[in-house]
Amino acid sequence: MEQLRVGIIGLGQRGYGLTEQIFLNMDGIRVTAVCDVYPDRVARAADLVERSDHPRPFEATDYRELAQGNRVDCVIVAASWSCHTEISCFFLEQGIPVGCEVGGA
């Protein structure tokens, strides 16, 4: 089965928890990129993915980097609520599907 390549943007409590408890345990999903403005959160999430017997994901502190190089099939936005619209619109304009962990944020 082909895997859906997911990028996670925002790796605070919500984004890290979604990655750890949901995305790393779903068949057909591979976390291929992690992003947060805080480098320590990016490294922590990348370590988590790798410890879960998945390839180490691409790491970024600028969400725009996830749209380059065919890295993701979709992104999950779990960043600060004030950033959801900006980030979501950017990816939608690139033709990349978006999921927001908070609807209408």
What does each model-found stretch correspond to?
Residues 1-52:
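N-terminal Rossmann-like dinucleotide-binding module
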Residues 15, 59, 84:
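Conserved donor sugar-nucleotide recognition element shared by glycan-biosynthetic enzymes
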Residues 32, 57, 73:
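Conserved acidic residues
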